[in-house]
């Protein structure tokens, strides 16, 4: 990836038949703890009312330069009851699980049996589940819960804490996408600032859209050095068009 892309990237938003790269301010949030990734696209007054969209229209947000873009989110428009023509709210496929209602009883079941049923009800076919043996329950009952709450209840009932989320439109439970290479975040290079707030470090970086939560990255900084797991990322633009990225990870005061 060229330095020019990293230093002065551009957002490209596709909603239905529209492709927008100007007149927008963008904020994207991704976290394995919150399950659902989202992106808010604020439209300039010139665009408000001109861009027509409806609930569940397919939408993507990409960041890059010229013809080299990486996807930040690939999901659907969520329209509420407010002035939604002023902004476009995009959420990933977890929105399907949030909107489906589960009422079912499962006999002699493993957690994977329940999750596969929930995914089928939500119309989700691409998934990778942990193949670990967590044991069976004689009876497991769900009474009118959303798909997200049902999967959370599976974790709670079996006493496990498997993260679950979507990446590149694939659902993961207790697993994650295979990582082919590890990226290095360096002081004086990709890292602009590094500070700790509570249990998490916040690394303000140049825009690196191919880094996502649950990936491992190597941090090389005078305040902290080591291999860490990304907990969440925030990418946003300001009214000048500048792009800011924040990468969060857990770690001690120093590991140098």
Predicted regions and their residues:
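Assembly/oligomerization scaffold segments
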Residues: 1-95, 200, 232-243, 252, ...
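Short beta-strand-centered interaction patches in the first periplasmic/extracellular domains
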Residues: 2, 85-94, 128-197
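Short beta-strands and strand-coil junctions in structured, solvent-facing domains, enriched
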Residues: 48-49, 125, 159-163, 236
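Short, charged beta-turn/beta-strand-edge "cap" motif at the junction between a beta-strand
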Residues: 63-69, 220-227
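Hydrophobic alpha-helical segments and helix pairs
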Residues: 84-126
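Surface-exposed, non-catalytic interaction/assembly patches
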Residues: 98-110, 149-152, 175-223, 240, ...
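Low-complexity, intrinsically disordered Gly/Pro/Thr-rich segments
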Residues: 216, 225-238
């Amino acid at each position: 990836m060229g330095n020019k892309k990293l230093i002065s990237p551009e957002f490209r938003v596709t909603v239905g038949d529209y492709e927008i790269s100007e007149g927008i301010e963008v904020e994207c949030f991704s976290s394995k703890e919150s399950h659902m990734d989202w992106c808010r696209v604020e439209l300039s007054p010139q665009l408000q009312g001109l861009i027509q969209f409806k609930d569940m229209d397919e939408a993507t947000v990409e960041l890059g330069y010229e013809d080299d873009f990486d996807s930040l989110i690939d999901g659907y428009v969520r329209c509420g009851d407010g002035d939604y023509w002023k902004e476009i709210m995009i959420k990933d496929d977890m929105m399907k699980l949030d909107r489906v209602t589960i009422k079912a009883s499962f006999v002699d079941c493993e957690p994977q049996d329940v999750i596969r049923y929930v995914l089928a009800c939500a119309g989700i076919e691409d998934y990778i589940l942990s193949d670990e043996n967590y044991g069976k329950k004689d009876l497991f009952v769900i009474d009118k819960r959303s798909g997200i709450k049902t999967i959370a209840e599976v974790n709670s009932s079996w006493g496990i804490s498997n993260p679950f989320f979507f990446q590149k439109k694939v659902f993961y439970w207790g697993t994650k996408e295979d990582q082919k290479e590890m990226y290095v975040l360096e002081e004086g290079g990709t890292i602009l600032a590094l500070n700790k707030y509570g249990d998490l470090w916040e690394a303000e970086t140049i825009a690196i859209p191919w880094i996502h939560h649950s990936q491992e990255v190597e941090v090389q900084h005078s305040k902290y050095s080591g291999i860490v797991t990304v907990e969440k990322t925030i990418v946003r633009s300001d009214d000048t068009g500048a792009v800011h990225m924040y990468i969060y990870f857990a770690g001690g005061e120093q590991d140098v």
